[in-house]
Amino acid sequence: MATLLLEDGTIESNLDEIARELAPLGVYIKHYDPGTSILFPHLLIQDALTDKEKCHIVDLHNSVFEFIQQENGYLWCDLLNVHPGSPNLQTLIATYAKYHTHTAPEALYVLAGEMIFGFVKPDGSQVQLLVQSQDYLHIPSGVEHWCSLTASLSFKAVRYFTAADGWVPNYTGTQLNDSLNK
């Protein structure tokens, strides 16, 4: 279940309160437990996956979550599978660990592992959101954010796209608030 770290050090774990904090940004978070993970538990704990296994996971997931694609106009999706042995892991981390925006929305449903997203709120304050298994996150286009793996370096999520080129980061130059990283 998601948790939100506010700039003043407050940690919020109530999903309704997290949603309220993120609402001014248009960021949407919801926790869904469709039960699909019981259909492929061995694949969720496995680091490397074949293309066939990835397609199997996405197909099973989409059979339950087709409404997400229809409601939001997502054109396609894929499975993001990051683990300590992932090729180009450090490049992936460096690409998204700086504040950026996208011209298209960023949306994902977490299957396993966890990731941290940082946001700049309209008042200039910064918050960090930890998403975990069964959390669905939708970030509208133009919202300033960054994301990073946690220390486990392990994350599996179905990513949803509205543009053929996916999520291209446009860096903003905003500095991460060090007080959130203590």
UniProtKB/Swiss-Prot annotation:
Annotated metabolic or biological route of this protein: Amino-acid biosynthesis; L-methionine biosynthesis via salvage pathway; L-methionine from S-methyl-5-thio-alpha-D-ribose 1-phosphate: step 5/6
EC number: 1.13.11.54, 1.13.11.53
Annotated residues for binding of Fe(2+): H100, H102, E106, H145
Cofactor binding note from Swiss-Prot or TrEMBL: Binds 1 Fe(2+) cation per monomer.
Classification via Pfam families: ARD
Reaction it catalyzes: 1,2-dihydroxy-5-(methylsulfanyl)pent-1-en-3-one + O2 = 3-(methylsulfanyl)propanoate + CO + formate + 2 H(+); 1,2-dihydroxy-5-(methylsulfanyl)pent-1-en-3-one + O2 = 4-methylsulfanyl-2-oxobutanoate + formate + 2 H(+)
Keyword field: Amino-acid biosynthesis, Dioxygenase, Iron, Metal-binding, Methionine biosynthesis, Nickel, Oxidoreductase
Single biological process term from Gene Ontology: L-methionine salvage from S-adenosylmethionine
Xref: HAMAP family: Salvage_MtnD
Family: Belongs to the acireductone dioxygenase (ARD) family.
Summary of the function given for this chain in its UniProt record: Catalyzes 2 different reactions between oxygen and the acireductone 1,2-dihydroxy-3-keto-5-methylthiopentene (DHK-MTPene) depending upon the metal bound in the active site. Fe-containing acireductone dioxygenase (Fe-ARD) produces formate and 2-keto-4-methylthiobutyrate (KMTB), the alpha-ketoacid precursor of methionine in the methionine recycle pathway. Ni-containing acireductone dioxygenase (Ni-ARD) produces methylthiopropionate, carbon monoxide and formate, and does not lie on the methionine recycle pathway.
The protein's assembly and partners: Monomer.
Name of the protein this chain belongs to: Acireductone dioxygenase
Provenance organism: Trichormus variabilis (strain ATCC 29413 / PCC 7937)
